[in-house]
């Protein structure tokens, strides 16, 4: 009974963390003060998440490592690291939730590192969630055809998510190329959340297919069914996203500057005298 209760608590914490992550990535909707308090809430949930999963850390140096365990361990540790740095840098710029921690480190550096690590946390959180999906799908006991249809539909959705990821300029944050956050304050709040969900879905889909690929590598040859199918699905999702991006780019180029990321509908979050800094999302861990 206690085991079931612990599992339920873990699931609730996971769901709450995912919801808060989506809120943190919607800075233009929540505003600065609420963004900081949501970040504090996320920090508390992540600490609780580590406590609930403390046995995982106790077993990290025990047993053999198969491809799936290697992949999940790398993602989980990278996710925890990205969260710690995101939270630290966010608190170093805080003007509302924990203003007494302002200036713990250079604010200009903290701003760029916060953007950099928070977007990596978003990517890694998606992959972390996705790597647990095959287990949940297995419990649904779907027929092979049903599973294939579901995979194809999710592949299309993931492709749309990749398109939005590119359109919103996310890759620039991942490679430490963007010093300030470019946010569209004219976009409807519901659309911001929908885009965040779709972008997260892309990385969750990648995580799912990586997990399936790792598990396939552990099977005997006679047990494997379409072992390269996960690779095909990943490539298909990427191609769908790139094609939509190319088509969208061509259309917006003919649309007299409307749509996309134009200076007329995009605000650059700047900091004057480094007294106010951009805060974009605190997140996550295993």
Regions found by a protein language model. Name each.
Residues 1-286:
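Membrane-embedded alpha-helical bundles that constitute the cytochrome b-like, heme-associated redox core
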């Amino acid at each position: 009974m206690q085991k079931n209760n612990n599992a339920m608590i873990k699931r609730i914490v996971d769901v709450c963390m995912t919801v808060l992550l989506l809120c943190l990535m919607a800075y233009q909707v929540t505003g600065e003060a609420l963004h900081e308090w949501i970040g504090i809430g996320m920090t508390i949930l992540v600490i609780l998440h580590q406590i609930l999963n403390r046995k995982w850390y106790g077993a990290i140096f025990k047993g053999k490592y198969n491809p799936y365990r290697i992949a999940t361990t790398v993602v989980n540790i990278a996710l925890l690291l990205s969260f710690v740095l995101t939270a630290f840098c966010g608190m170093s710029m805080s003007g509302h939730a924990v203003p007494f921690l302002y200036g713990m480190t250079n604010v200009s550096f903290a701003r760029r590192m916060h953007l950099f690590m928070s977007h990596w946390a978003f990517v890694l959180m998606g992959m972390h969630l996705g790597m647990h999906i095959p287990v949940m799908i297995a419990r649904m006991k779907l027929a092979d055809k049903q599973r294939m249809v579901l995979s194809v539909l999710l592949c299309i959705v993931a492709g749309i998510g990749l398109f939005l990821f590119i359109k919103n300029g996310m890759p620039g944050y991942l490679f430490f190329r963007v010093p300030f956050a470019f946010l569209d304050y004219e976009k409807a709040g519901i659309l911001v959340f929908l885009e965040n969900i779709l972008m997260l879905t892309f990385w969750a889909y990648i995580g799912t297919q990586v997990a399936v690929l790792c598990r396939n590598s552990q099977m005997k040859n006679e047990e494997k069914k379409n072992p390269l199918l996960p690779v095909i699905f990943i490539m298909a999702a990427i191609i769908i996203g790139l094609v939509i991006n190319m088509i969208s780019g061509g259309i917006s180029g003919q649309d007299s500057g409307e749509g996309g990321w134009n200076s007329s509908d995009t605000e650059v979050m700047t900091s004057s005298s480094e007294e106010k800094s951009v805060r974009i999302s605190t997140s996550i861990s295993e």
